[in-house]
Structures are given as C-alpha cells and as structure tokens.
C-alpha cells in the first residue's frame, strides 16, 4: 500500500529554484503588534546553497491550509542561516526568518529635527538607512500634521521611534 505525503509547509527563496527546500519542522511566534519570529528546519538535495545570498534575499514561509483556503504567508529576510549537516545526499539547513521591518530594530541612533513635519521626519529616517533598503509605500491618513518646533530621537531604533 503506497502512501502519498502532502506538503503542508513551504519555504520559498529566489536563491534556490533548481532544487527546492522542503520544510522538516519549525517553531515560531506571531501576533498582533508583534513581529513574527520563525525558526525553520529545511532539507535540500543541494549541499552547495550559497548561505550569503540566502541571507540577502527576501524569503517566504507558507503554512498551507485544507481545501481552497489561502495559505498563511510570512514574508521577510533570514536573520540567520546555518547548514546543519549532510546525510544520504541531502543537506539540512536551519533558517531564522524575521519580517522586513525587523531590520529597523537593529540600529540605535540619535537625531534632532527642527521645524519639520512628521512626514518629512519619517521620510528622512527611512531613506537614511543605506545599509538595508526595503520596498515600502509611504501613506499617512487624511489630515494635516503640524511641524513641531523640536523633535528628538535619542538612542532609539527606527522601529521604536
């Protein structure tokens, strides 16, 4: 009697297209007002995955659901990648996946803003991050935001500020 396995989880990276990754396990947390945090164990027939390129590439983790329901999708960047071993022609990897916004938690800085509108302050802060660029859309709800005389960011991350 043959058994067919149905894939329930997917890890997708533009780096690995010829021989895909297969999820063997994961742990993680996600919730309202919280950045998700997934540790994903993978297996791949390619033992020569360029982990440097994998770290720099946007990845997606999907939890597939029954029927025609859309999968739960978590997109972000690997914060850490390890090759854990090699056995019987397969390489085992561990990936720590964080959302793109997580990168904004990695740098503390200080800045002073004089007579600048909120929109201008936000644009300046986000555009100042040259060591990591990420696609974003800048939208504020209707209304006029005043330009405070003085605003300061002191030893805060961009995410916290």
Sequence positions of predicted segments:
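Amphipathic alpha-helical and helix-coil boundary elements used as assembly
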Residues: 1-161
